[in-house]
Amino acid sequence: MLNQKIQNPNPDELMIEVDLCYELDPYELKLDEMIEAEPEPEMIEGLPASDALTPADRYLELFEHVQSAKIFPDSKTFPDCAPKMDPLDILIRYRKVRRHRDFDLRKFVENHFWLPEVYSSEYVSDPQNSLKEHIDQLWPVLTREPQDHIPWSSLLALPQSYIVPGGRFSETYYWDSYFTMLGLAESGREDLLKCMADNFAWMIENYGHIPNGNRTYYLSRSQPPVFALMVELFEEDGVRGARRYLDHLKMEYAFWMDGAESLIPNQAYRHVVRMPDGSLLNRYWDDRDTPRDESWLEDVETAKHSGRPPNEVYRDLRAGAASGWDYSSRWLRDTGRLASIRTTQFIPIDLNAFLFKLESAIANISALKGEKETEALFRQKASARRDAVKRYLWDDENGIYRDYDWRREQLALFSAAAIVPLYVGMANHEQADRLANAVRSRLLTPGGILASEYETGEQWDKPNGWAPLQWMAIQGFKMYGDDLLGDEIARSWLKTVNQFYLEQHKLIEKYHIADGVPREGGGGEYPLQDGFGWTNGVVRRLIGLYGEP
């Protein structure tokens, strides 16, 4: 990837100097609360909270040895293994035998750990099924039932059934689940919607936020905050009344705004940045600054080539994972080098749009419950965020939303994340019209809309298209009256997925859509995954709206 040619169709937007020299960071507010920042889970009746230690914390040098030795092709495999005995006993045994001449690390791991189950090998698709039938038959395959928690496993037990994306992802994921839920609702699976609603509310109650996924190594970060959108979906589909989730929405908001009151202009703490004019906007963050358990070796290698303190790089890699866009030119100072990642220095347009939706949802539900003061407070917060986004993230010259580099005080790259303000109703009609023109000319292809217009070798860039981006673009443009563009994206995406399904009899995580011939999407840290939860969800919903392609 480092030698790959970067195609930049808009050089004016890429005037970013490569700066790999480390400087002391006066902008980050250091508070005592950052020590041991991860919340301790509570006990609830009927389901004991899971042990929150990560595999890296628990197995120490054994964990590093296994990951460094590449015993498994995928770095996620070992963190997902479950020990056959007390981890302390395993560690003691390892320390006793590791220096023996005939020590075999692979055999040691096989003797002391249960490997993760591989579910995908159990399912064979029927080529005679239509796309709709295929998706409806996949829901049981992607469903995981609540189970007694395996002692010392990284999997966090949940009280109800849930849907997983598929492939290597054998746990539920926060923002993936919203787009999966769209399809569940269309398939009439209100039972699963109720289960997943209960699970996410349970995680907020017990961990103070919804983690990236239900693994111990995901507890230190969240993902794009879409619980307010889930609550809206629950209300629309008669699954649960929105009022019952008001406290959960407030708790999630407190997580994202933690430390805001202590900040002065040009200072940041965790997820919050106070801008030069005193307004508050948010960034992605992870409370840990170590290599990710699930991508340990990849992170170590990336940090080696960064020219920066490793812990700083690890934090930015983790924050990039929290964004859901792992990885993309959006987070890179030099779009050809993952080692130049600076996620925590960008104010993302999509994150702040989702938080606008959260603030608006709290205000709306508070109004339904007659809580006038709370309603007024959160309407003011939503209005202030909308104004700040317009000041800092709206590029009036080009008619687009862009991320904002708050450390350099300049706009960053244009990507499909720019459509999220339309999806949540934050843009005005003039902004929506101008953005539609930019999307038509810069991101739209015969196969759907591209994640970005930059070819970097990262998976959230050109030539890839992703289901959640299609859905938000379709609905966002239609909400502002541009049915023509919304319908074009919808039919293009349905054609892409159906054409690939007819040839390969499967749905996948992402698609190569740059040239009108649907192919498997590439890039990223891991092989392409089949399944696939949010692709199934979005396509099933679109079939309900547009019919089978």
Swiss-Prot record:
Subunit structure: Monomer.
PANTHER family: CYTOPLASMIC TREHALASE, TREHALASE
Active site feature: D326 (proton donor/acceptor), E509 (proton donor/acceptor)
Domain of life: Bacteria
Protein name per the record: Cytoplasmic trehalase
Biological processes per GO annotation: cellular hyperosmotic response; trehalose catabolic process
Positions contributing to substrate binding: R168, W175, D176, N212, R221, S222, Q223, R292, D293, E294, G324, E525
Function: Hydrolyzes trehalose to glucose. Could be involved, in cells returning to low osmolarity conditions, in the utilization of the accumulated cytoplasmic trehalose, which was synthesized in response to high osmolarity.
Gene3D superfamilies: 1.50.10.10
Location(s) in or outside the cell: Cytoplasm
Enzymatic reactions: alpha,alpha-trehalose + H2O = alpha-D-glucose + beta-D-glucose
Family membership: Belongs to the glycosyl hydrolase 37 family.
Primary subcellular site in the record, as a coarse category: cytoplasm
Keyword entries, A-Z: Cytoplasm, Glycosidase, Hydrolase
